[in-house]
């Protein structure tokens, strides 16, 4: 499977260069056999990347399949390849998932949760018992 003209293998990158890499990508692959929470997926989605990830660990919670990205069967190269091909073949779908991913991640931002907790505390303080 020769994809060297269209794929750049980045390898492990220092934290300070990640945003630069995300800005250069359309699709982020996470073919993990096991995965914790999925922070990489969240970072990628916050930067408008569409995540194609294994259906494992916390990834199904983060990557809403068919809404903000795509999930594939763990260990299935064919399933992963089909998901990638569907995105490349349908640019409007890629753009839709990219836009939805940004919107989705913003709903769970630190600032948003801080404001929600702040509002909750204010209501609790001002509520008469």
Would you name each region that the model predicts?
Residues 79, 86, 93-107, 116-119:
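A short, well-ordered alpha-helix in the C-terminal region of glycosyltransferases
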